[in-house]
């Protein structure tokens, strides 16, 4: 069953009528609803085009958080072969919010790091709603070190509202873990491609997104804080999240114009949740192209390019 966002009501109403007509035709074969269903399907497509061609930043935030949007595990199943996840940080514990391991990508050995939110109550609790603890970032560091040692390109898929802010996480060095992970991303002498597939929240996202090439899906978001968090800090009113989202420049178009990301991956009509297979395939093509472009570069050049990219970003924004 499709989950509709509040601004998708016209689409919901039309698709609801289509479902009713199909049910009616099933119950009474003498009734021909083919033509009416065809007309309604055309209207659905027109409604989707009309709505999704002018999404505001807050609506894009809602799409980025859509519960049926493909998550890391969906990309991993399709994009990677022989994915072997590694567990634990060898210091304290395992954190399922970050999935990391070794795999093959179109025949090429790679290291993979991603944030997983989960898709139902049980899995969301297991993955801590995609908010990593220090152990997750230290696990990512393990994978980055391994990739650097064996010359494996790194692919990271970002989807988090932010790092977990709990007391225990702070006591175990959350800030240090994020900083070390970011430092490691900047230091490896292998290609590093990052894609924001949903939410890219604050340091919790950038800790695995400091890549040579950084991309965003068309309806994903990337920001220093969530719109609700920004509204709470700026105006002491989280209900002004829509206003905050507009002012924060969090959309893929905004960040491309600012030079924060290198490219935007188009989503299917109506968002990635309406056609996960096509957006996953498109993401794979972009990653493959980026890796091919970087293949001739030396490890030293890759590292220097990455560092200069982010230093320039800090100077120019």
Swiss-Prot record:
Keywords: ATP-binding, Cytoplasm, Fatty acid biosynthesis, Fatty acid metabolism, Lipid biosynthesis, Lipid metabolism, Nucleotide-binding, Transferase. This is Acetyl-coenzyme A carboxylase carboxyl transferase subunit alpha. The keyword Lipid metabolism applies. Component of the acetyl coenzyme A carboxylase (ACC) complex. First, biotin carboxylase catalyzes the carboxylation of biotin on its carrier protein (BCCP) and then the CO(2) group is transferred by the carboxyltransferase to acetyl-CoA to form malonyl-CoA. One of its GO terms (biological process) is malonyl-CoA biosynthetic process. It is found in: Cytoplasm. PROSITE patterns: COA_CT_CTER (PS50989). It is an enzyme of class 2 (transferase). It catalyses: N(6)-carboxybiotinyl-L-lysyl-[protein] + acetyl-CoA = N(6)-biotinyl-L-lysyl-[protein] + malonyl-CoA. It holds the Pfam family ACCA. Belongs to the AccA family. It comes from Rhizobium johnstonii (strain DSM 114642 / LMG 32736 / 3841) (Rhizobium leguminosarum bv. viciae). Pathway: Lipid metabolism; malonyl-CoA biosynthesis; malonyl-CoA from acetyl-CoA: step 1/1. Residues 40-293 form the CoA carboxyltransferase C-terminal domain. GO terms for molecular function: acetyl-CoA carboxylase activity; ATP binding; carboxyl- or carbamoyltransferase activity.
């Amino acid at each position: 069953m499709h989950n509709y966002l509040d601004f998708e009501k016209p689409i919901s109403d039309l698709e609801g009528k289509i479902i009713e007509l199909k049910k009616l035709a099933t119950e009474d074969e003498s009734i021909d609803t083919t033509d009416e269903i065809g007309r309604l399907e055309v209207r659905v497509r027109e409604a989707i085009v009309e709505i999704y061609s002018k999404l505001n930043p807050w609506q894009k935030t809602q799409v980025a958080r859509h519960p049926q949007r493909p998550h890391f595990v969906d990309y991993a199943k399709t994009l990677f072969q022989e994915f072997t996840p590694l567990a634990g940080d060898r210091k304290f514990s395992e954190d399922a919010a970050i999935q990391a391991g070794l795999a093959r990508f179109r025949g090429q050995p790679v290291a993979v790091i991603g944030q997983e939110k989960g898709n139902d109550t049980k899995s969301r609790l297991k993955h801590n709603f995609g908010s990593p603890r220090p152990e997750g970032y230290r696990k990512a560091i393990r994978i980055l070190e391994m990739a650097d040692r064996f010359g494996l390109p790194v692919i990271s898929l970002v989807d988090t509202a932010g790092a977990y802010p709990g007391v225990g996480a702070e006591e175990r060095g959350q800030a240090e873990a994020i900083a070390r992970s970011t430092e490691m991303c900047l230091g490896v002498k292998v290609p590093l491609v990052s894609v924001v597939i949903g939410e890219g929240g604050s340091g919790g996202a950038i800790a695995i997104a400091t890549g040579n090439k950084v991309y965003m899906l068309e309806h994903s978001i990337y920001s220093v804080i969530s719109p609700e968090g920004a509204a709470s800090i700026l105006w002491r009113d989280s209900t002004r999240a829509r206003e905050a989202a507009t002012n924060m420049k969090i959309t893929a178009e905004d960040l491309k114009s600012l030079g924060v990301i290198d490219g935007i991956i188009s989503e299917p009509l109506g968002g990635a949740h309406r056609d996960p297979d096509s957006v996953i395939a498109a993401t794979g093509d972009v990653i493959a192209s980026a890796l091919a472009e970087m293949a001739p570069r030396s490890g030293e050049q890759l590292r220097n390019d990455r560092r200069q990219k982010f230093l320039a970003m800090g100077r120019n924004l």
